[in-house]
Amino acid sequence: MEREQDTARYIALALDLGAADAVPFTPDDIVFEPRTILKCMFGCEDWGKGPTCPSRTGSLMPWEYEPLLRRYRWGLIVHSPDKKTAQEASFAIEQRAFVDGYYLAFSMSDCACCPECVGLKGKPCAYPKKARPAFHSVGIDVFATARGMGLPIQTLASEDEPQNWYAAVWVE
């Protein structure tokens, strides 16, 4: 009963913060796919620069996250057409869950803390306690996961098209 109540409160929090959707998941709902690193390595101009990306020294490789994340029993997927909203909602849920006793709660979201990432310029991250790895950078197929949960996502022909941003909060 407590989990159901907490889930409902966290969903309400995400929606109150502007998320379009917040959907509960178990690790079995998440599609782990180590090939996601190829999109980072050969599709991201920030490869080797981002303070939360898998290219940074000492970072786990995407396929090394799966056994860690499978130890969680449940969490929430947060969807928003706005990257910053997805990050802020997921981080707020992580903080609330921690206060509620879920001390290992952990959020993942494309970082939108700064208008322009200072880490990409070789400077220390301005928000090291808030910056998190992107959902896809840890070996998760965001497209297959979102589609499996009935959430909207498609490839875009242009960056001007409406976007779907996803974050995850691993609660317990």
What positions do the PLM features span?
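Auxiliary alpha/beta "docking" domains used to position bulky ligands
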Residues: 1-172
